[in-house]
């Protein structure tokens, strides 16, 4: 690595911090589904940062290619989740997790 370039440890620390924020967001937020989806996306982003960091460190492009597949699946998951949420909001006029839990029957 050149002088002034971030090291592998810096990327792994960034990934760990983002993953921790995502976990806290999932466990502390039990009310709003949109924030819950954003926290899950943050978890996926942290995993992607770690994959790219290890891929670059090892000199192998497989991790970077795998990240593109993960981002594609994450985008599809977010689009489907938001579409379901919009349909639910139009019917129930609420996006609270507690209200969605009442759908069990």
Swiss-Prot record:
Location(s) in or outside the cell: Cell inner membrane
Q: Specify the domain of life of the species encoding this protein.
A: Bacteria
* Swiss-Prot/TrEMBL GO biological process terms: ATP synthesis coupled electron transport
Q: InterPro entries, alphabetically? A: NADH_UbQ_OxRdtase_chain4L/K (IPR001133), NUOK/Mnh_C1-like (IPR039428)
Catalysed reactions, semicolon-separated: a quinone + NADH + 5 H(+)(in) = a quinol + NAD(+) + 4 H(+)(out)
One GO molecular-function annotation for this sequence?
quinone binding
Q: NCBIfam families per the record? A: PRK05715.1-2, PRK05715.1-3, PRK05715.1-5
What name does the UniProt record give this protein?
Answer: NADH-quinone oxidoreductase subunit K
Protein source organism: Acidithiobacillus ferrooxidans (strain ATCC 23270 / DSM 14882 / CIP 104768 / NCIMB 8455)
Q: Tell me what gene encodes this.
A: nuoK
């Amino acid at each position: 690595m050149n002088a002034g370039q971030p090291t592998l440890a810096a990327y792994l620390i960034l990934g760990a911090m983002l993953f921790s924020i995502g976990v806290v967001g999932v466990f502390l937020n039990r009310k709003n589904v949109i924030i819950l989806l954003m926290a899950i996306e943050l978890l996926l982003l942290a995993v992607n940062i770690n994959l790219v960091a290890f891929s670059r460190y090892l000199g192998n492009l497989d991790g970077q290619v795998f990240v593109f597949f993960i981002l594609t699946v994450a985008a599809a998951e977010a689009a489907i989740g938001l579409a379901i949420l919009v349909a639910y909001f139009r019917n129930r006029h609420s996006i609270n997790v507690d209200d969605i839990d009442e759908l069990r029957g």
